[in-house]
Design a protein with these regions (language model features):
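A short, exposed helix-loop element centered on a Lys and neighboring polar residues
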Residues: 123-124
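A glycine-rich helix->loop->beta "capping" turn
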Residues: 54-57, 77-88, 96, 107, ...
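Residue(s) in the substrate-gating loop at a strand-loop-helix junction
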Residues: 143
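Conserved glycine-rich Rossmann-like NAD(P)H-binding loop of the short-chain dehydrogenase/reductase
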Residues: 31-46
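The beta1-alpha1 cofactor-binding region of Rossmann-like NAD(H)/NADP(H)-dependent oxidoreductases
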Residues: 41, 62-74, 105
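Substrate-binding pocket helix/loop in short-chain dehydrogenase/reductase
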Residues: 99-100, 107-112
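Canonical Rossmann dinucleotide-binding motif of NAD(H)/NADP(H)-dependent dehydrogenases/reductases
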Residues: 3-34
């Protein structure tokens, strides 16, 4: 039996990049995968097909993770489609680099909304599901920039 056989993992921001790699690894370990991204375009459909080729159930959901209501709606849809949520990986993230003196409030807010608020939104939506199951794991991704800092990334770190 594989490590995550029969589990359902939700990975945010997983149509490509690190999120996709996480989704694929969890699928290799037997987890069914629900993943989100701002849009499910050809990248998202390719990711879904790649995950399904590993013999597990997979579905991509278009979702603005920074929107509280939309996040709750997509989590309800995931539970309807998969029956449960065992693992949540808060991976969604963006960068909008710039020196503080040149950074707009919009740039600041965009990064914090996706990188921080989205984690709150998904935890808030998934926690009742996990509590009802009496089990669940939440993984919050972050960057080394939060520890070491980087010029132009005050909003990211």
């Amino acid at each position: 039996m594989k490590l995550l056989e029969g589990k359902v993992a939700v990975v945010t921001g997983a149509a490509r990049g690190i999120g996709k790699a996480i989704a694929l690894k969890f699928a290799q370990e037997g987890a069914n995968i629900a993943f989100t991204d701002l849009v499910i375009d050809e990248n998202g459909l390719a990711t879904q097909a790649e995950i399904e080729a590993l013999g597990v159930k997979a579905k991509g959901y278009a979702s603005n993770a920074a929107n509280f209501e939309e996040t709750h709606n997509v989590v309800a849809e995931i539970v309807k489609d998969f029956g449960r949520i065992d693992i949540l990986v808060n991976n969604a993230g963006i960068t909008k680099d710039g020196l503080m003196m040149r950074m707009s409030e919009g740039q600041w807010d965009a990064v914090l909304n996706v990188n921080l608020k989205s984690a709150f939104n998904f935890i808030h939506a998934c926690t009742p599901v996990m509590m009802k199951q009496r089990a669940g794991s939440i993984i919050n991704m972050s960057s080394v920039v939060g520890v070491h800092g980087n010029a132009g990334q005050a909003n990211y770190s």
